[in-house]
Amino acid sequence: MDRVWRAWDGQSFKENQPESPSARGIVVSWLSRAEWEQVTVYLFCDDHKLQQYALNRITVWRSRLGNELPLAVASTADLVRCKLIDAAGTLGTDELRLLYGMALVRFVNLISERKTKCSNLPLKYLAQEVNIPDWIVELRHNLTHKKMPHINECRRGCYFVLNWLQKTYWSRQLEGSLKETWELDEDQLDAEDPEEEEREIIADDVLEEIPEPQDDDKDEELAVEDDANTKGNEEVASHPEPSSRHKELYEKARELLVSYEEEQFKVLEKHRHLLQAIKVWNNLSPRVQCILEELKSISWENRDAVLDAFLDDGFLIPTFEQLAALQIEYEDGQTEVQKGEVTEPNSHKNIDLNEVLVPKPFSQFWQPLLRGLHSQTFTQALLERMFSELSTVGSTGIRPTYILRWTVELIVANTKTGRNARRFSASQWEARKSWRLFNCSATLDWPQVIESCLGSPCWASPQLLQVVFKAMGQVLPDEEQEKLLRVCSIYTQNGENGLAKAIEGSSSSSTGKAPYTLDTLHEDLQPPGTNCESEESIQQKEQGNLKDVKQEEKKENEEEEKEEEEMEEEEEEEEEEKEEEEEEQEQEEHQEEEQEEEEEEENQKVFQDQMEADVEESDDVEEEEEVDDEEEDEDDDYDDDEEEDRMEVGAFSLAQGSSVFENTRTTSRKREALQGSAWQVSSEDVRWGTFPLGRLPGQTEDPAELMLDNYDTMYLLDQPVIEHRLEPQKSKSSTLSLCCGGSNTNSSSSSSSGNMEGLLWNQGQMHGLKAGLQLF
C-alpha cells in the first residue's frame, strides 16, 4: 500500500534506513502554496480558459522536475487536457477514444507500477486497495487488449478518475494532510492492522467507501449455506456491495439536487421577480454546470440511483413550501369541484389530461438540469419509472398529481413537430412551444413506452395511452390502438376501489390482483354513499378551502385562454391578409405580362407593315428613276429627299420598337440574316434605355475589353489608294458647295459633276447607312 502512495507522490524510499527530519524535506516545482491552491481550483472548475491556464502551469512544473513530477499531477493534467479537446470539438470520435484510452491506461499502469515490481498480485486487487472499482480496470483491459470501447464509456471513466484524483490527492493537499497520511514508512504500515487502515480511510472522508464484510456476516453466510462452493460464497459476499454502492450514489445524488435547489432559490431571492429569475436560470452558472456534470457521471454508473433521488419528495415532487416560494397555488387537478355538488372519490375518471401540465414556474425551475441530462435512455427510464410509481400511489394528493403532470409533460415535450404535435390541445401545444424541457426531441421507443404504461395499470392509464398514441403517430394502426384502449379501460374499470382491493388481496394472489367474485359485484352495485361517507367528509373539508382558489384560477385561465385565442385569430387574419395581397400582386403581374405581350405583338405587326410598305415604296421609286430622263434630275432629287425622310422616320420607330420587344421571338428576315453574326439581336432581357450609347451591361472602365480577339495587320503600301483623296481642294469645295447649295443655284449646277466625282455616296445613301447602322 505504501508503495502505491509513494508512487503517486513521485518519491523513492529505502527500506532499512530510517528517515531523519532533514531528509523529509521535499523539493517542489511550484513557487508557493498559493500557486498550488490556484492550480487545484482552476483544474476542477468549469471555465475552459482557467483550466488551460492550470495546464500551462503544470507544464512549467514538469520542465522544472522532469520525471520527478508527482504522477497524480501528470495523470490529472492528461485527463483534463482530454476533456478540453473533447469540448473544443476539433477531433473526431476515433481520435478522442485514442486520447481518452491513452490517459486512462497510463493512470491505471502508474498506480500499480511500483507495487507490481515487488509482488505478482493481479491488477484488480491492487486497484481495490485504493478504492478503484473493477470496471475501471476492465476498461483499461479492453483499451489495451480488446476492442476499443464506446466514446461514452471513455468519458465516463475519465470523469470518475478525475473525481477520484480530486478526492484522494488534491483535496488532501488542500487540507494539509498529505505529509501525514500519504508518506508513511513501510514498517509502520506493516505493523498496522486492516481495521485501523479502514478507520483511517473512513476518517479521511475522501476516498469512496467500499465496506468489507465483517467476520460475523461471513459466519452467518457460512451457516446458512454450508454446502455452497467457493464461487457461491464469492457471489454471496459480493451481494452487499452493489446495494451499498447504490445507496452511496443515491445519497450523493440527493446532495447534488439539494445544492441545485439552493442555487436556484438564491437566484430567485436575488431578483425577486420570477420572470427575471427564469432568464437567469436558463444561463447555467459554473456551480450548476459542475452539479450537472457530477449527476451525469453518477447516471452513467447507476441510473436508478439518480431516478430514485429525482422522484423523492422535495425535488420533482414539490413540497408546499417550495410551491409557495415559486408563487404556485396547489391544485389537486383530479376533480373539478362545483358549487353545491358532492365530490365523489371516483370522479377522477373524468379527468381531462389535455389540461394537466406542470406549472410553468416549476417546470422552468428544473428545466436546466433536465435539459442537460436529456437523452433517449435517461428520459425513457424516467418515464417508465413514473409509470410504475403512478400505479403504486393513490389518486389524490400532491405526489400522484405531479407524477401525472410530469408524465404528460415528458410525453408532450418529446413529440416531434408535424402532424403528431398538431393532435394536441391548445394548452399542450403551448406547453411544447414555450414550456418544453428540451431544445430537440429525443426519439423514444414508443412501443416500449406503451408496454410500460400497460404493465403498470392505474386509474389514469387509458388517458395516458391516448396521449402516447397522439405523440407517437402512426407507429401502431388505429385498430390496434382502439383495442388496447378498450382492454385498458376494462382492466382499470374498478378504479380506486379495485386498486384498494388489489392491495388487500395481494397475499392471496401472486399477481397482486384480487379475484372478481359475486361479493365484489354486490359491493360495486351498492350506492357510493354507504361506504364512502367518511372519505367524502374528509375530502370536502380538504377541498372546501380550495374552492375559492380554484375558481380564481379558473377565471384567470379563462382570461388567458381568451387572450391566446384573440392572439391566434389576429395572427391568422394577418396571414390571410398577406396571402390575399400576394395573390393580388401575382394577378396584377400576370395581367401586366399579358398586356406587354399584346403590345409587343401589335408593335411587331406595325413594324412588319412599315417594313413592307418601305420596301414597296423603294421599289416604286427605283422603277420611276429608271423610266425618267436626265431632265427630271431635280424631281428625282426631290423624291430622294422624301425617301430619306421616310427612312429616318422608319429608323426612329425601329429604335423605339427594338427597346420594347428585344425579348420576343421575332422571325423577321432581318434577324434571320443577322443570326450567327456579331450583329445578331440579343435574346436577353436587357433594358437598353438605362444604358448610355456605347455602354454594355457589366462593362468595366478598362478599354482593353473592347479589343478584338482576332485581327490581321495591313501595311501601308498594301492599302488601296482612292484618286479623290489626292485632290483635297475639290473635296473641300464640293463639301462647301453642298453646305451653301441653297443660296446660290449657279454654283450648285456648275459643281454638280465635281461633287459626284469626289463623293462615294450621295446624301440619301448616307442617311440610309446611318439608319441601318446598329450599335451593339
Curated annotation (Swiss-Prot):
InterPro entries: Las1. Residues 185-247, 501-646, 733-759 are annotated as: Disordered. One of its GO terms (biological process) is rRNA processing. Disulfide bonds: none annotated. Pfam families: Las1. Keywords: Cytoplasm, Hydrolase, Nucleus, Phosphoprotein, rRNA processing. Residues 228-247, 544-557 have a biased composition (Basic and acidic residues). GO terms for molecular function: endonuclease activity. Residues 741-755 have a biased composition (Low complexity). The keyword Amino-acid biosynthesis does not apply. Component of some MLL1/MLL complex, at least composed of the core components KMT2A/MLL1, ASH2L, HCFC1/HCF1, WDR5 and RBBP5, as well as the facultative components BACC1, CHD8, E2F6, HSP70, INO80C, KANSL1, LAS1L, MAX, MCRS1, MGA, MYST1/MOF, PELP1, PHF20, PRP31, RING2, RUVB1/TIP49A, RUVB2/TIP49B, SENP3, TAF1, TAF4, TAF6, TAF7, TAF9 and TEX10. Component of the 5FMC complex, at least composed of PELP1, LAS1L, TEX10, WDR18 and SENP3; the complex interacts with methylated CHTOP and ZNF148. Interacts with NOL9 to form an ITS2 pre-rRNA endonuclease-kinase complex. This is Ribosomal biogenesis protein LAS1L. The gene is Las1l.
